[in-house]
Amino acid sequence: MKRDKIPSVSATVDPEFLDNFHLLLTDQTGNNTLKFYCPQIDANAFNYDNLILTLSDAAAHYCLSRRTWEEYKNKPMQLSRLVREKFRRLRTNDGELGELMLFSFLEADLNAPKIATKMELKTNPNMYFNGADGVHYIKLPNGNYQLIFGESKVYAVLMDGISAAISSIHKFKTDTIKDDKTGETRGITFERGLISAHIAQETFSDEDKTFIKSLIYPKASSTYYVDTAFAVFVLFDITIPQEKKKLGNAEFRDWLFNTLTTLIKSNIKEIYAKITRKNLDSHSFYFYLVPFEKLDSANTAVLEGVLQ
């Protein structure tokens, strides 16, 4: 049953999504990969115009299951309206942009297709609980697989976002997330069952269903191994002093890139230490970290641009 490609369960975000960012730093330590991206800059300010366009393309694949997408893909007006409606039903959640960007990075950078559409589950009050923000899979070079559960945070302070994400992942893994409605504690066990129950929404053949189920519930008889991994996306705030904006464009980029790289390098050890303190170091972690200036207003403006 070992396979090279699952045609109906493949990544949908164009790798050109990554061209919206400057990759300032990549760190690989043990099982962990950390990538730090800076948005494009125009005249000493972050420029989100192209990001909005590419996120607009990704939004439909993020919030609609493959079967729903297939139903509406040749009806662009209805498709666009359906996407906007789903987002607007959740606009009280300031983290939606972060979850869309988490999805986009996992698909564009890791080529890790989603296997569950969390937006459809969120908008179904009978199906959703506060579990992972995304569920994807990746085939490794050795032929084995990882089932990746993603966590997204939008925080003013980078390390506060990291701490919150790792704490959430720990609760998720240990099945100690409290359900707001029932008071029950749930986590990865419940999530696996939820995903399994909705496989039909993401697949188009019995063969694909069998494959995806083998990732959710691995069997010793399988021809490949499956390990649980986690992805963390943090969108955080940076303040750019007004005097720095008066620098020449090239000088400004040098200053900003050096400042941001120094910030990340000074925190890498502590980021990995947080994983260790939660006894999660046996898992692979994929970190994607992105700064916005004036985070609250930029977050709102970008998401509104995506939904226009």
Positions of PLM-derived features:
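A structured, charge-rich N-terminal accessory region that forms the first stable segment of a protein
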Residues: 2-78
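A short, highly charged nucleic-acid-interacting micro-segment common to nuclease
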Residues: 81-103, 124
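Conserved catalytic cores of phosphodiester-cleaving nucleases, focusing on short active-site segments
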Residues: 106, 134-136, 146-154
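Secondary-structure boundary elements
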Residues: 107-115, 138-145
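A short acidic/basic microdomain associated with nuclease active sites
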Residues: 110-126
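A short, glycine/Asx- and small/polar-enriched loop/turn
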Residues: 127-131
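Acidic, metal/cofactor-coordinating or nucleic-acid-engaging core segments within structured domains
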Residues: 163-248
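Extended, charged low-complexity segments
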Residues: 244-308
